Regions:
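N-terminal basic/disordered segments at the start of proteins
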Residues: 1-27
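Short glycine-aspartate micro-motif
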Residues: 5-9, 132-136, 201
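Ser/Thr-glycine-rich phosphate-binding loops at phosphate-binding pockets of nucleotides
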Residues: 12-14, 118, 138-144, 206
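Helical "lid/coupling" subdomains associated with nucleotide-phosphate turnover
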Residues: 19-22, 36, 40-65, 80-91, ...
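A structural signal for short, well-ordered beta-strand segments
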Residues: 31-35
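Post-signal peptide N-terminal segment of secreted/secretory-pathway proteins
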Residues: 72-73
Length: 304
């Protein structure tokens, strides 16, 4: 079909693909896989050969499932590639072996596109608000966006579920790091000249959607984003997911959250909880929509 676009978001842990009808602003199909792009990055400063091969395998699976040519896809990549010393060689390797040409986008563009996706998601879910806070917990960075009427304010924090997990396993300073980051979040919030007290707190990315999925009783294999979208989580839901991580066997956890997410869910939950505390919020609305949807909507708007 002439009115289709494929968008790919290669994150620090996840690889997400969307087939999108850009004339009617509708999702046709999608694919998601954990590729662990940032594995080992904090120690070596490099994207590993093993990670690159996982990305190429994921592209090949996705192109067969969604029937597309990788060279025609709109492909973006984020924090892991921004940080890696060998990012250009890594991107050249991916293009040479798959045809997919990735663009490294900066944190502000990543936040703008994710915000675009959430604005459309709010309309779709009939949630009428111009003022909200958006949290995007990534693998290598975490973005906080405050949307106030026609303006938005972005702060990108240099930590994510993968990098903080790797760092804490190396130095054991997780809670110290979280406290330091809380100070940084508060500093950013103090620059705003309006109150966010009544702003809904919206969260996207794998950690919030996984906790929502656990709350709703889904397994990894019957996850339904249409039901997850709009789910409201509170601090007790976060605490329940942390308890489950300690109580369940590895086999049970793989069925619940998927193989590539188990090792990061604990730290991801602590990061999520950090923002509840720093923002002084009691609950959070979860959306599955994120960067890949934002890239697709941005493309659709450019074709209008």
């Amino acid at each position: 079909m002439k009115n289709e676009v494929i968008t790919i978001d290669l994150g620090s842990n996840s690889f997400r693909v969307l087939k999108y009808d850009f004339l009617n602003f509708k999702i046709i199909d999608e694919y998601h896989q954990v590729v662990g792009l940032a594995d080992g990055l904090i120690n070596s400063g490099l994207i590993s050969f093993e990670a690159l091969n996982r990305v190429i395998d994921a592209i090949n699976i996705a192109k067969d499932k969604l029937s597309f040519k990788p060279e025609n896809a709109v492909c973006v990549t984020t924090a892991a590639m921004r940080k890696a010393k060998n990012s250009q060689e890594a991107l050249d390797f991916i293009e040479k072996n798959s045809g997919a040409k990735f663009e490294i986008i900066d944190a502000n563009e990543e936040a703008r596109l994710t915000l675009l996706a959430i604005k459309y998601a709010l309309k779709r879910e009939k949630i009428d608000t111009q003022n909200f806070i958006l949290l995007d917990i990534g693998g290598g960075s975490t973005e906080l966006i405050v949307n106030f009427e026609d303006n938005f304010y972005i702060k990108s924090f240099d930590f994510g579920i993968v990098t903080m997990t790797q760092k804490s396993s190396k130095d054991g300073k997780l809670f110290e790091d979280l406290e330091n980051q809380k100070i940084e979040i508060k500093k950013f919030l103090s620059t705003l000249d309006f109150s966010i007290k009544d702003f809904p707190f919206i969260a996207t990315a794998g950690t919030p959607t996984t906790i929502a999925s656990i709350k709703l009783g889904f397994s990894y294999f019957n996850y339904d984003k249409n039901i997850v979208n709009g789910t409201i989580l509170d601090i007790k839901d976060l605490e329940d997911s942390l308890k489950l991580l300690k109580q369940k066997t590895i086999k049970e956890l793989i069925e619940m959250v998927g193989k590539g997410r188990i090792e990061y869910l604990e730290i991801g939950t602590y990061i999520y909880r950090l923002f509840f505390d720093a923002l002084e919020k009691d609950n959070s609305i979860v959306f599955d929509d994120g960067l890949r949807e934002g890239v697709a909507i941005n493309y659709a708007l450019s074709k209008k």
